[in-house]
Regions:
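Structural beta-alpha unit
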Residues: 2-32, 127-158, 162-171, 178, ...
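Redox- and metal-dependent alpha/beta enzyme cores, enriched for Fe-S-associated oxidoreductases
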Residues: 81-133, 137
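Short, small-residue-enriched loops and turns at beta-alpha junctions
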Residues: 40-41, 109-113, 137-140, 166-167
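Alpha-helical scaffolding segments of alpha/beta enzyme cores, especially the outer helices
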Residues: 24, 51, 94, 118-121, ...
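Intrinsically disordered or low-complexity boundary/linker segments at protein termini
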Residues: 20-106, 183-192
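A short, terminal or domain-edge coil/loop segment
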Residues: 9, 13-17, 57, 61-69, ...
Length: 192
């Protein structure tokens, strides 16, 4: 919560069987924040994040254990034209409106349904100046290409519509969301 320029937060110690024990808390939070660490014993980290995303109806912010110098000043929107990506843009509009720079990144753009220029025009109507950027994955994964481009534009946050492919397919084959969770040092704001 932000009041008079000061922010506040509450922290809860959750008792019970993870990941389901977090659901009642996650549903009433403004945002769910997870700090990624390499030292998690006996807990499937991606299950915890998936539960927060699928079962809370709230945004989830994943940050690495390295504290960033800034956050939400230079935002990358990972745009694939999906309903989840559109929802992510809508839910983060206040952040986008206050950012110093916004970039819409598409990877291997193949169609008009996820044309970054059309999204930029829509954002402009909401007071957000966004720069469309296309890139190719080539031999790298989509998440690697996305991270590389985000680093190049000095992004301090990536906004993504999480799990835009079905949950089972993402669990079996991986996917951009899951790959970003494990590889990005840039904070990721995920919306499903």
């Amino acid at each position: 919560r932000i009041e008079n320029g000061h922010s506040s937060a509450d922290f809860e110690v959750v008792m019970g069987q993870l990941p389901n024990a977090i659901i009642p808390f996650a549903r009433i939070a403004d945002i769910n924040i997870f700090v990624r660490t390499d030292n998690i014993d006996d807990l499937d980290w991606s299950d915890l994040i998936q539960t927060a995303l699928f079962d809370s109806g709230r945004s989830t912010l994943l940050v690495s254990s390295v504290v960033p110098a800034s956050i939400a000043k230079r935002i990358v929107i990972a745009w694939n034209g999906s309903a989840e990506a559109a929802r992510a843009v809508a839910m983060t509009m206040p952040l986008l409106q206050q950012a110093e720079a916004v970039f819409i990144i598409t990877v291997d753009d193949e169609g008009d349904d996820h044309n970054p220029s059309k999204l930029a025009a829509t954002l402009e109507m909401n007071g957000v100046t966004a720069t469309p950027v296309s890139t190719n994955a080539d031999q790298a994964s989509v998440s690697s290409a996305l991270i590389a481009k985000a680093v190049k534009v000095h992004a301090d946050m990536i906004v993504i519509g999480a799990y835009s492919h079905n949950r089972l397919g993402e669990m079996i084959f991986g996917g951009v969301t899951r790959d970003l969770q494990s590889r990005s040092d840039i904070p990721i704001l995920m919306v499903h």
